[in-house]
Amino acid sequence: MESTLKYILYALALVVAITGLNVLFGGASAIPGSTGGAEATVDNELRFFSVFWLAYGAFCFWVAQNIQAQYKFIPSIALVFFIGGLGRLISILSVGPPASVLIPAMILEFVIPIAIYGIYWKKYIKNITKQSCGT
């Protein structure tokens, strides 16, 4: 279980780093399905927030490398990713659907955190509960 969780976190860190760097250096036109040429303010904000996305990826990588010592951060990683999916859903409800390639991204942003938390719960919380009950 621990190695599965570790590899999921490494994969998440890699995808996040690639997409973060892509937007940081490519701006709005680097987003899949973009028609290019975004307003300067939108491009500016996207590049700014891409740095936080990169930091999230680095954090996922750090937790994966030190998973036994840093397991307590796993629920936060899952929660942030899930809330990102909620952000996409709010956008769809507010301004309409994005490019079709981003719909699977939103679905993954709901599914992956649930899987991460499920593995976390089974590996860490369940064991802690067993130990405190003396079984």
What are these regions (language model features)?
Residues 4-8, 13-43:
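Membrane-helix boundary elements
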Residues 14, 18-22, 42-64, 79-83:
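Core segments of alpha-helical transmembrane spans in multipass integral membrane proteins
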Residues 20-23, 60-64, 88-91, 116-120:
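Structural signal for membrane-spanning alpha-helices in multi-pass inner-membrane proteins
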Residues 35-43, 97-108:
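Non-cytosolic membrane-interface motifs at loop->transmembrane helix junctions
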Residues 51-60, 109-120:
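Hydrophobic cores of alpha-helical transmembrane segments in multi-pass inner/ER membrane proteins
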Residues 74-88:
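Hydrophobic alpha-helical membrane segments
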Residues 86-103, 121-122:
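Membrane-helix boundary connector in multi-pass membrane proteins
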Residues 111-131, 135:
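Membrane-water interface at the C-terminal end of transmembrane alpha helices
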